[in-house]
Amino acid sequence: MLDLAFVRANLELVEARLRARGQNPAELLGDFAAVDQHRRERITEAEQLKATRNKLSEEVARLRKAKEDASAVMEETRQLKTKIEDLERAATEAEEQLRERMARIPNLPYEDVPTGASAEDNVEVKRWGTPREFDFAPKPHWELGEQLGILDFERAAKLSGARFAVYWAEGARLERALAAFMLDLHTREHGYTEVLPPLMVNSRSLFGTGQLPKFAEDLFRCEDGEPYQAGKYRENDHWLIPTAEVPLTNLFRDETLDDSQLSTSLVAHTSCFRSEAGSYGKDVRGIIRQHQFQKVELVKFTRPEDSAAEHEALTRHAETVLERLGLPYRRMLLCTGDMGFSSAKTYDLEVWLPGQQVYREISSCSNFDAFQARRAGIRYRPRGQGKSAHVHTLNGSGLAIGRTWLAILENYQQADGSVRIPEALIPYMGTEVIESRNVAQGAK
């Protein structure tokens, strides 16, 4: 959430940055200035009447002490009390209107974020690794996985419907090996603290990280007998997490951290659940876009002056996973029109997929500035200062396990259909190659 005082003092700048995002400021802000002015005027009037009431109360006391009639002054005091209550109620209603507007306004992009309308305007920052030259036509991961008997879409559809997968044998082991490898790397070398959070969170948590109220349709809500009405939710509703960013960030919700606790770096391996409401017809083959998937998530809480450097560090931590696995990738700086709702600056890491001849996103690393901290009430007390301030929050995938899994299949496939295991994963896999096991080829 943006700072109300900042928006009030910099309304033209806010409108310009929203336009750079491809947003309509008039639609988002509405009559923000008028409502804010109305609220401030009602507060001022109420304060003035309170001062008058206090003087009248003193007059009542004086009259009573002098044993004089104070009824007229007391009646005036009662009338003032009613007027003050009406003014305060009007100010509260205006503040609620402002909060509702502010909750739906996205973060403002940093000045060094390129202006653009879509992914076509993102800027490539770097490339690592040279895509392998094959002496045969490389296959996409869905063909490789089914031929090896380690990926089963037919049975997954029988169990759960579209956009689910069953992993068999070495396929399941490769997912587990990737998670263990990533967690070990981030905790042992990058200084993250591992957390195992709940997979269900309340509405307040999703508001804190920015998924609610605007993106409820992208989430899975857990039914509790109460009929759900689109666009309406309750504070105690439970939702399946779309990413571990949500529980990790909200661990410190409504808390004030000590300066010595920053920067704090957390990592979690969890299942993630997304409805993919707006992706009908996209990536219908393979495991690029699933309702349920595994991810290792990185989250940082930093001082404002450290967040830019910590953003670069977090992105490098995600890149290190790809480099250790020998997977070619590129880093993209997202333009204003392609950024997430809560982000002030985002790098996407895109891995090369030879079976599809394309780079695909495998990690998104974002600096949220104080946007999430303001929504979630996460503050810290700077050393030597009495007044607290909002922390900056950052997060990134370190990495999406399913997409790393498919990238290994496509980049390490052999002419005979087998798949070599990257050297860094051999200790976790206990084998150097995945060959066809026909595990999933039973009766159908």
UniProtKB/Swiss-Prot annotation:
The keyword Cell cycle does not apply. Catalyzes the attachment of serine to tRNA(Ser). Is also able to aminoacylate tRNA(Sec) with serine, to form the misacylated tRNA L-seryl-tRNA(Sec), which will be further converted into selenocysteinyl-tRNA(Sec). ATP binds at residues 274-276, 361-364. InterPro entries: aa-tRNA-synt_IIb, aa-tRNA-synth_II, aa-tRNA-synth_II/BPL/LPL, Ser-tRNA-ligase_type_1, Ser-tRNA-synth_1_N, SerRS_1_N_sf, SerRS_core, tRNA-bd_arm. The keyword Cytoplasm applies. It catalyses: tRNA(Ser) + L-serine + ATP = L-seryl-tRNA(Ser) + AMP + diphosphate + H(+); tRNA(Sec) + L-serine + ATP = L-seryl-tRNA(Sec) + AMP + diphosphate + H(+). L-serine binds at residues 243-245, 297, 397. Belongs to the class-II aminoacyl-tRNA synthetase family. Type-1 seryl-tRNA synthetase subfamily. This is Serine--tRNA ligase. PANTHER family: SERINE--TRNA LIGASE, SERYL-TRNA SYNTHETASE. Pathway: Aminoacyl-tRNA biosynthesis; selenocysteinyl-tRNA(Sec) biosynthesis; L-seryl-tRNA(Sec) from L-serine and tRNA(Sec): step 1/1. It holds the Pfam family Seryl_tRNA_N. Its EC number is 6.1.1.11. It is an enzyme of class 6 (ligase). Keywords: Aminoacyl-tRNA synthetase, ATP-binding, Cytoplasm, Ligase, Nucleotide-binding, Protein biosynthesis. Consists of two distinct domains, a catalytic core and a N-terminal extension that is involved in tRNA binding. It is found in: Cytoplasm. One of its GO terms (biological process) is seryl-tRNA aminoacylation. One of its GO terms (molecular function) is ATP binding. GO terms for cellular component: cytoplasm. SUPFAM superfamilies: Class II aaRS and biotin synthetases, tRNA-binding arm. Homodimer. The tRNA molecule binds across the dimer. It comes from Acidobacterium capsulatum (strain ATCC 51196 / DSM 11244 / BCRC 80197 / JCM 7670 / NBRC 15755 / NCIMB 13165 / 161).
